[in-house]
Structures are given as structure tokens and as C-alpha cells.
Amino acid sequence: MPANLSSALETFKQQRDAAEAHYLKANRVSVFFREYTAAVETLLAALWAEYFQNSALCLMAVGGFGRGELYPCSDVDLAVVSPAPLSDGIQEQIARFVQTLWDCKLMPSVKSGSVDELCESVRNDITGDTAFLEARFLFGNRQTADKLAEKMNAQRNVAAFVEAKLVEMEHRHAKSQGSGAVLEPNIKSCPGGLRDIHTLLWIAKAQGLATDLPDLLKQRILTRAEAGMLSHGYRRLAHIRIHLHLNAKRAEDRLLFDLQPQVAESMGYEGLNLRRQSEELMRVFYRAIKTVKQLSGILTPMLRSRVSSAPMRVTLRIDDDYIQVNNQIAARHTDIFFRRPEHIFKIVEIMQQRNDITALEPQTLRAWWGATRKINRSFYQNSENRHRFAGFFRNGNGLTQTLRFLNLYGVLGRYLPAWEKIVGLLQHDLFHIYPVDDHILTVVRNVRRLALDMHSHELPYASALMQSFEKQDILYLAAFFHDIAKGRGGDHAIQGIADARQFAADHFLTGEESDLLAWLVENHLLMSAVAQKEDIQDPDVLDAFCKRVQTHERLSALYLLTISDIRGTNPKLWNAWRASLLESLFHAAGRYLTGNGGNPHTLFGRRRQEAADLLTRAAVPEKQQKKLWNALGSAYFARHQSREILWHAANLVHDFETPIVRSRILFKSDSFQVMVFMPNGPRLFARLCRIFSRHGFDILAARAFITEHDYILDTFIVQIPSQHAPEDYPDIQSALEAELNSFIHGHTVAETQSHSRRISRRSRYMPIAPSITITPEEDYPDWYSVEITAVNRPFLLADMAEVFFAHNVSLRYAKISTLDERAEDSFTVFSLDLKNPKIQSSLKQTLLEQLS
């Protein structure tokens, strides 16, 4: 590199570093863009003079560089423009110029060609056309630059350009779905991200309007309030993107888990632990994109209508205040929302009641939104407003869209201050993937779908139950309030009771309705906790659950709310196994509440009799049956449900001395049930768990049982890896049975060591602190319940079993609750030593070491 260029490069580095230092000190986005853009232009000036002095070419900044929005590691978008086709010599010179840019670490993105060639290249390329919309002359022949701009503008079909940009935005939003896009969003391309702001400005500029927000305000495209909010949202997002680049030291636009704490810290979220810093950063981010989405919903249709040929206008009278224009509702006088604030809810009520109205007309939406910022205590205390708000839930029709609309435009938070506290609040707990407000509205949607016959195919039984449930509006409200107290510290289920009861009192619910609502909010986690963590075949567990529930109405409501909550937390959580657990508990509790639960001795006797009847029908002699029951022992019937007993008995009755393995695919499920019967020995349970983990199975539940003649009868529910199709299941089943058969007949099976385990990036950078509780079982001396919460990983259950074995603790039952990347496991164990506090403390410490 020539000496003069080396000097220019050194000057650039100094100016770049100064721009970054000034930014980190003053925290002003516009100053950083101005200083960094100037630094790049200074370097380009030296390079241009070196390669193209006195040339007919010109250099133009395009794209982000053209609009002066250059981030620390962004591409530098350039165009080298010639009045005539490029000769071979000029092309070689341009190639050397571009290579020098790379040598300077500028990451150039360069288009080159004649005016005609460049115009032709973007004729059917919306991305290229958009880049040249931002074109800005830098150096060289200005006449060539002016000619290019003139020809580009002349060939651009503005209406087609606007439509193409809106379609592009729709496709971009569609790609930003799924848990990854929510948890690690792309700050540029996500809905409400920087690219949406750019799209608004491009649409305006293509129409010959202003190129920045202050000018759009002067041209009355934006109101002062809208310009202020959009500027604020833009600055928030730009700050985050600058810090992302500086911390990642690359052009990284995703808020990755490993970068979130670094960005949060560098942005000044001090005095909080790393997780809280990250949550606060994400909350700022979600609120910023929400602002952009609000304004985009208002401005996009207004800008579009300026150039698009509107469909034939069909106007219908609704009442004295409103008309219907095609599929939109419009106010006859847009100041109605300021003069008569009760119309803030009335227009939404009309939209909810009429299926042929899907939106507010843009000018009406703008006026309505402006008025909503005046919602205050007086508005809340107005009984007409309260009746209408409660009516949204009683009506049910279009409830999800109504609540999402009100949330998007900030109305829910202004009407209910408790709601405002959860907007954008993300929980780094390894299984929630949505901000709390989005999660709640997804749960409301799930409850509502159960009430609609068109969705009955998804969950037929739950849908039928919901469609016959009398108090559907209370169930919608329970979904709305179940997590409203998140983020306050303490038990959100308990804290939410006061919010629910206050709402009920203010919105004319009866005492009975208020009681049901408050009970559901308080107990919304009860059914999932019992079904997933406890042995629902244990009569004591069922008895305790039913004492909390008490009525069939509560049971049905809790069942429907629980299903909807799990499905709305994370798509990965809902599966056939969880569905079967909840349904089994629902039916068992229903029988109990009807008086058909029976006492434990009757229940165990009935289980044994059902198995005996099956064997008798299969012509198994009574004497042979009795031998089997004696070998299994009386405790067997207390620890297994009827379906398991029938399955075990059919496979063991003819020979309960020979080791066997059996498996079956559970009905309508992606899971196997596996039984292993063999002579007892050391570490068998742990070694079996390792076999399942090595095959990629998730262990959903496990029951370890030792017979009277010292055989193990272990039963597992394992989930098939998600990448396998149902047609693969028989082959997977055969391969698993073959390895298990080798194991039970004494053939050595290589054991995979747990140190090879892998966990996700989310688990690495947003881990949860492991916790362990050990509680003695009432009425059962030397039996203990062990509860473990930790980051989920392969071989976790096997490692826990190894620890139990090393401490002379006999594992009898394991209930595995895997919540995406979070494991909440419950174990029932037997030990003569755990009553000693030192031994119990030693067990806890060893378990924590395995979990950390």
C-alpha cells in the first residue's frame, strides 16, 4: 500500500476510534453516524484520488451509507458509475480499488457499471432499486451522478415500488416467527425493527416526500407526537445495534444470548445481575419495536393510499357517529374520541361485534390512538367504559384480535396499570419464549380456540368440554389475569388474586364469578404441577388435589386453562405425553369428586382384580396367577396403574424368572413405553438411562420397582427424537429393544460419559440456578421426595441415579418434567440413612455438583 494511503488508513482508524469513544461518552446516535460516516468518506477520498483522479467516473454512497446511517461493522455500500460501458482496463482498476477497501477492513459492497447498465440491473430488483433510492454523490463526475439519479427516478413505478416494499415487509415478518426469532431477535429485520422504519421512509421518499422524520413532520405526514415517538423508538433500536456491533466486533444484528449481557452492561444497565440486565435490555427492545409497529400500522396505509389505486369505495351507515368504508370503520368526525372519550371503547366494540369490519380507517385510527393517550383514572371509573371492557370478554367473538389491538396501541396498559408493568417483560427461565404480555394473549387465544367449533379437530375432548362450559368469559378473564403479577418478586399467583378481585368488583362480576376468577388465578399452576411432578396413581396425591379443587366446575376450568397455558408458553412443551397426563388427572379427579374414587385398599384391590380377570380370560390358571402376585408383592399395586399392571401381567405370568424387555408405542404419541425385567444388580437404573440418552430419547417418566424375589421391574416413558417421522418408529423400536436385550442378558454395553454432554447457547448464557429440596414422606418412614430444578441436558437422569446409588439411596420412582431447556424432576427414594442431617447434606451437595 502506498505511503500516502497508509497515512490515510491510519487517520481513518484514529477518526473511527474517536467516533466510538465520543459515542460511548455522549451516547448520541446522530453524532456517531456523522463522525463515523465522515471518517469513512475521508478514507474513500484518498483512495479515489489514488485510483481515479481526473476520471469520468463518479463514486456514490448508496444504501445505509447513502443515508448516513453507518453502523460500526456494517457494509459500506458504494456504486462506481460510468457515463459509458466500462472498459477492461477500468474494470481492473475498479477491482484493485475494491481490494484495497477490503485491505482497509471496510467490508465494501460495490456495484459498478454505466448509467444504463445500473438502471437496467435494478429494473426488476427491488433491493437494488431501494439502495439507489438512497444514493448520495461522493467524488468524481457529478454530472454522471445526476444523470443516474434522474434516470433511476424516471424509470421507477412508484405505486409498484410501494407495493413491492410492503410485500417484502410481510415476507420479512413471516420469517421472524418461532422461538429463535423471539428469544434472539434480529434488531434490523424483526417486526417493528429498524428495517420497518426504513421502509416507511423509502415509501415516502419514492413519492417525492421528505427523507427524514423532522421533514415529514414539516410536511404534515407525521404529527408532532408521532414524529417524537418514532424518533425515540428509532434511537433506542439504533443504540442497541451500535452496541451489538461494538461488543460482537462483527456485523451481528441478532440479540444473541451470549451478547445480551454484554450489550446490557455497555448500555449502562448497572446494579442488576446479568440476567436482570438482559431482561431489562429486552424489555426496552420490545417496547421500542412496539412503538414502531403502532406507527407503521397508521402511516403505512396512509402513505400507500397516496399512490395506490383504491378499490371501489363502498360506504354504509352504521349509526350517527360511524360509517363502514369497505371493510373498515370510520368516524364521521374524528374529534369524537376527544369530545366523548367513551367512544374509545365503543368503536372497538362495534368492530368486535361485526365480522365484516376488520380495521379502523387510517385517519380514524390516528385520531383514536391520539385520544387513547388521554386515558386516565376518570376514564377507568366511568361505568360505561367498564361495561364495554368487560363486554369484550363476554362477547368472545374476535376477542384475541381485540385484545392484541388494544395491547399494540398501549390501551391495555393505560386502562389497567398492572398490565403496563408486564409489557415487554421477558423471563429468562429456559422455557418461556414470549414477553409476558404476548404470552398472556396467546393463552387467551388458546382458550378462545377451544370454544370455536372450527378448531375442534386440534383438541377434540377439550374443545367439547369448553363448548359446554357455561362461564366462558370467566375463563377468558382467568387467562388474561393468570400472569399479570409477574415481575414483582414473590409468588405471582398469590399476588395476582388482588388484581383479579379488584377487576371483578369494578366490572360488575357476581360474587360467584369473582370467586372462580380469583381461584383460577391463584391455582393456575396446580394441575400442571401435580400431573407432571407427582404420582397421580397415588391415592394420597389425588385426594390432596381434589381437596384443593372441590368442584367439577373448577376442575373443568382449571383443565382448560392449564392446556391453554402450556400451549402458549412454548410450542415445544405441548406433546401427547403431557396431554395424556393432564387428561388422566382430569378423569381421575372427576371420578373422585363424583364419589367413585374409592379408598386406597379398594383401589388396589380393583387393579389386581382387573388383571386377574384378563389372565383368566386368557386361560391362565389361578395357581399361576397367584405365584405372579406373590412375586410382585402387594406394594406393586400401589405403585402402578391398571394399564401398566395389565401389560406387565400379560408378559410375566408364564415366566417371571427370565429377563425380558418389552416396548410399545403409545397411542397417538411420539413416545414409547418400555418395561425392563431382570435380576437386581448395582447401577442398573442409571445404566438403562444412559442407553436411552445415547439413542437420543428424552425420558419423560420412570418407575423403578423391586419385586419380592429381587428382580427389577422398571418402566419408562421415553420420547422419540423429533427428527424422526412416524414411519421410522418401528425401526427405532427394534433397535432400542435389541440393545436393551443385549444388556439384560449380560452383554457389555458401552457407557457414554456425561462429560460429552452439550447444552444450548441459551442455557449457557442464561442458566438457572439449580435447586434441590428433600422432604420426608408423611406416613412412610424412610421414604423421601426429592425435587430438582436444573438446566436440562442429556444423561441428567442417569447422573442423578448414579449419585443416589453412591449414597446408598434406592430410587423407586422418577417423574421427569422437561420444560424445553429446563428440567423439573421429582424422585421418590428410600433410604435408611437420610434421616441423618450430615448424610442428607452430603447427598444435596453431590447432586448440586452434578447439576452445576
Swiss-Prot record:
GO terms for biological process: regulation of nitrogen utilization. PROSITE patterns: ACT, HD. Uridylyltransferase (UTase) activity is inhibited by glutamine, while glutamine activates uridylyl-removing (UR) activity. Residues 319-672 are annotated as: Uridylyl-removing. The keyword Magnesium applies. InterPro entries: ACT-like_dom_sf, ACT_dom, HD/PDEase_dom, HD_domain, NT_sf, PII_UdlTrfase/GS_AdlTrfase, UTase/UR. Its cofactor is Mg(2+). GO terms for molecular function: [protein-PII] uridylyltransferase activity; phosphoric diester hydrolase activity. It comes from the Bacteria. Coiled coil: none annotated. Its EC number is 2.7.7.59, 3.1.4.-. Residues 436-558 form the HD domain. Pfam families: GlnD_UR_UTase, HD. Residues 673-757, 785-852 form the ACT domain. Residues 1-318 are annotated as: Uridylyltransferase. It catalyses: [protein-PII]-L-tyrosine + UTP = [protein-PII]-uridylyl-L-tyrosine + diphosphate; [protein-PII]-uridylyl-L-tyrosine + H2O = [protein-PII]-L-tyrosine + UMP + H(+). Keywords: Hydrolase, Magnesium, Multifunctional enzyme, Nucleotidyltransferase, Repeat, Transferase. SUPFAM superfamilies: ACT-like (SSF55021), HD-domain/PDEase-like (SSF109604), Nucleotidyltransferase (SSF81301), Nucleotidyltransferase substrate binding subunit/domain (SSF81593). Has four distinct domains: an N-terminal nucleotidyltransferase (NT) domain responsible for UTase activity, a central HD domain that encodes UR activity, and two C-terminal ACT domains that seem to have a role in glutamine sensing. PANTHER family: BIFUNCTIONAL URIDYLYLTRANSFERASE/URIDYLYL-REMOVING ENZYME, BIFUNCTIONAL URIDYLYLTRANSFERASE_URIDYLYL-REMOVING ENZYME. Belongs to the GlnD family. Modifies, by uridylylation and deuridylylation, the PII regulatory proteins (GlnB and homologs), in response to the nitrogen status of the cell that GlnD senses through the glutamine level. Under low glutamine levels, catalyzes the conversion of the PII proteins and UTP to PII-UMP and PPi, while under higher glutamine levels, GlnD hydrolyzes PII-UMP to PII and UMP (deuridylylation). Thus, controls uridylylation state and activity of the PII proteins, and plays an important role in the regulation of nitrogen assimilation and metabolism. This is Bifunctional uridylyltransferase/uridylyl-removing enzyme. The gene is glnD.
